[in-house]
């Protein structure tokens, strides 16, 4: 029964997504009819929307996009569509022409890539490439505004490309349904004028920067975490590459990701919009891009600061005067080993620092609790995590406060009864291992952690437990 229900739900999502796409195409044609003769050329151009052909490379490309009159002037439908751009003295016809003839690759269709891709499509970039190997998940939607509920479980790239085509059927949208890696990055990025990094992890940041240096492409790079964001343009007009600023990666403990630390939905939205702006400035030559400067955004105080960066380093191993880094070196380079981090925007990998004798599964703990064995369940997550969801009864002492709270823990353990077991858990089973290490060093020799933490509990014991 469960499998049949899941199949029906998947089919419903698929049909709803198809209906959304058809509704979008209907709205587009209706708006072009309302526009009168100025909109008819656009209607004719949009005839092939959705009739994509996929090649063996994993890229799907839509029909040909913006086309100009023989004398280079903008056609009537483009003048009507982009009239508010054309009225800007600093942008005008020449700016729109350059933008419509440019190609921009967006790496990542998540919180940053969502507004970024939507605005580039709406503003009329000639060819827009979108790279992402993930599927849409429900917990993406608070910040990844390009996706809809109907697309949950489907490819992010398909969802993003469909949304961009609904906004502007006159541009080319190229889909890459895979993660960008050293083995394919050069082939993909080589086809574009500008690359925009909208990813969320350290090894990919190094890889994209190295790729752009080898191909001599400008790189618009943004990041957002928690309530802060930042933005700069690398390897353009004398600006440094990522390695110029960070020749060695920071410690793993200093690298956070939104799946661990959280992010307020609007923050990547702000940075993604600014990334679109910087990409447009680079493509058109209008304004002063953030080359050699970094924009810092603080959402809580609503402050934006721009700080100066040092220039390109002549001693940089990758973009410096004597660099010998080649495309072959790039394709063989192990970015995950270099940064000690996974090439994924998802959760950090599990650690394994305890012997098997110091660990139990969540099912083993469930049996221990059901049998009424005396024990104390210690939850070492931060207090605000504990407020989200917890197993009852459990005591919350955050890992950061554990050592100073050992006397209180010892008293609680005595209250639980003589010979009580001390069982430790956290969100994913990493911090609980570190806690057990500390506890055993301090004399709590019977302490054990629950393998996989609350995520394993929700998966293997209680499917209704809220996983976050």
Swiss-Prot record:
Gene Ontology process terms (BP): Mo-molybdopterin cofactor biosynthetic process; tRNA wobble position uridine thiolation
Reaction(s) the record says it catalyses: [molybdopterin-synthase sulfur-carrier protein]-C-terminal Gly-Gly + ATP + H(+) = [molybdopterin-synthase sulfur-carrier protein]-C-terminal Gly-Gly-AMP + diphosphate; [molybdopterin-synthase sulfur-carrier protein]-C-terminal Gly-Gly-AMP + S-sulfanyl-L-cysteinyl-[cysteine desulfurase] + AH2 = [molybdopterin-synthase sulfur-carrier protein]-C-terminal-Gly-aminoethanethioate + L-cysteinyl-[cysteine desulfurase] + A + AMP + 2 H(+)
Taxonomy, superkingdom: Eukaryota
Top EC class, one word: transferase
Entry note: cofactor: Binds 1 zinc ion per subunit.
GO molecular function terms noted in the UniProt entry: ATP binding; metal ion binding; molybdopterin-synthase adenylyltransferase activity; molybdopterin-synthase sulfurtransferase activity; nucleotidyltransferase activity; thiosulfate-cyanide sulfurtransferase activity; URM1 activating enzyme activity
Pathways per UniProt: tRNA modification; 5-methoxycarbonylmethyl-2-thiouridine-tRNA biosynthesis; Cofactor biosynthesis; molybdopterin biosynthesis
Compartments reported by the entry: Cytoplasm
Family indicated by similarity: In the N-terminal section; belongs to the HesA/MoeB/ThiF family. UBA4 subfamily.
Protein name listed in UniProt: Adenylyltransferase and sulfurtransferase MOCS3-1
Organism whose genome encodes this protein: Zea mays
Protein encoded by which gene: MOCS3-1
């Amino acid at each position: 029964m469960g499998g049949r229900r899941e199949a029906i739900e998947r089919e419903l999502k698929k049909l709803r997504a198809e209906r959304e796409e058809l509704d979008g195409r209907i709205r587009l044609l209706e708006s072009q009819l309302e526009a009168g003769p100025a909109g008819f050329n656009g209607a004719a151009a949009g005839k092939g929307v959705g009739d994509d052909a996929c090649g063996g490379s994993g890229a799907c490309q839509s029909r040909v996009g913006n086309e100009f009159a023989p004398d280079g002037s903008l056609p009537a439908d483009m003048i009507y569509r982009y009239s508010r751009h054309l009225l800007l003295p600093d942008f005008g016809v020449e700016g729109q022409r350059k933008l419509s003839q440019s190609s921009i690759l967006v790496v990542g269709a998540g919180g940053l890539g969502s507004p970024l891709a939507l605005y580039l499509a709406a503003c009329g970039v000639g060819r827009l490439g979108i790279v992402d190997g993930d599927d849409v998940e429900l917990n993406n939607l608070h910040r990844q505004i390009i996706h809809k509920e109907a697309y949950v479980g489907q490819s992010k790239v398909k969802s993003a490309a469909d949304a961009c085509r609904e906004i502007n059927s006159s541009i080319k949208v190229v889909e890459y349904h895979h993660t960008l890696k050293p083995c394919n990055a050069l082939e993909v990025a080589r086809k574009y004028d500008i690359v925009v990094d909208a990813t969320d992890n350290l090894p990919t940041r190094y890889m994209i920067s190295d790729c752009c240096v080898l191909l001599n492409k400008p790189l618009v790079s943004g990041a957002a975490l928690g309530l802060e964001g930042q933005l700069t343009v690398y390897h353009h007009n004398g600006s440094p590459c990522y390695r110029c600023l960070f020749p060695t990666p920071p410690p793993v403990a200093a690298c956070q990701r939104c799946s661990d630390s959280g992010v307020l939905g609007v923050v990547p939205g702000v940075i993604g919009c600014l990334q679109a702006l910087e990409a447009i400035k680079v493509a058109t030559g209008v304004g002063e891009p953030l080359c050699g400067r970094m924009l810092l955004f603080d959402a809580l105080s609503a402050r934006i600061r721009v700080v100066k960066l040092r220039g390109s380093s002549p001693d940089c191993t990758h973009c410096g005067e004597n660099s010998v880094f080649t495309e072959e070196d790039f394709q063989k380079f192990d970015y995950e080993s270099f940064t000690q981090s996974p090439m994924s925007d998802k959760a950090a990998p599990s650690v394994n620092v305890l012997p098997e004798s110091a660990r139990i599964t969540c099912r083993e703990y469930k049996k221990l609790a059901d049998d009424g064995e005396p024990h104390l369940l210690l939850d070492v997550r931060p207090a605000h995590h504990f407020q989200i969801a917890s197993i009852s009864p459990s005591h919350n002492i955050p890992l950061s406060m554990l050592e100073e709270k050992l006397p209180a823990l010892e008293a609680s353990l005595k209250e639980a009864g003589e010979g009580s077991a001390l069982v430790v858990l956290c969100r994913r089973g990493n911090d609980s291992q570190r806690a057990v290490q500390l506890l055993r060093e301090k004399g709590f020799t019977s302490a054990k952690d629950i393998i996989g933490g609350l995520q394993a509990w929700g998966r293997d014991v209680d499917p209704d437990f809220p996983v976050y």
